[in-house]
Amino acid sequence: MVVRSILLFIVAAVAEIGGAWLVWQGVREQRGLAWIGAGVIALGLYGFVATLQPDAHFGRILAAYGGIFVAGSLLWGMAFDGFRPDRADIVGALVCLAGVGVIMYAPRAH
């Protein structure tokens, strides 16, 4: 279940971060409505993918996903925008990912 959850977080991150990047490109880089439309579709897909997580608690899923979003956004910037994170960016992303692990995968009494 953990592997499935992690894979779903990755798919959600690609959809949300990719969608936001497409909208950014369409508006800020003036690439046009097709880019914006593709971004809106990807953002909608992100919302759907989150519902596939095995945990039933919306707040927990979205809170944990926030950490994935932070780290994924830095990686996306590196891959597609030439961004180079500094030490503080990397440490911050690692703290967020540790938070994801605690929120999603810590043992709980049910």
From Swiss-Prot:
Membrane topology summary: Multi-pass membrane protein
Family recorded in the similarity comment: Belongs to the UPF0060 family.
Key words of the record: Cell membrane, Membrane, Transmembrane, Transmembrane helix
Protein name per its UniProtKB record: UPF0060 membrane protein MMAR_2961
Parts of the chain that traverse the membrane: 6-26, 32-52, 61-81, 90-110
PANTHER family: UPF0060 MEMBRANE PROTEIN YNFA (PTHR36116:SF1)
Compartments in which it is found: Cell membrane
Entry GO CC: plasma membrane
Signal sequence range: none
Keyword Zinc-finger: no
Keyword Transmembrane helix: yes
InterPro entries: UPF0060
Main localization (coarse): membrane
Organism: Mycobacterium marinum (strain ATCC BAA-535 / M)
Pfam families found in the cross-reference section: UPF0060
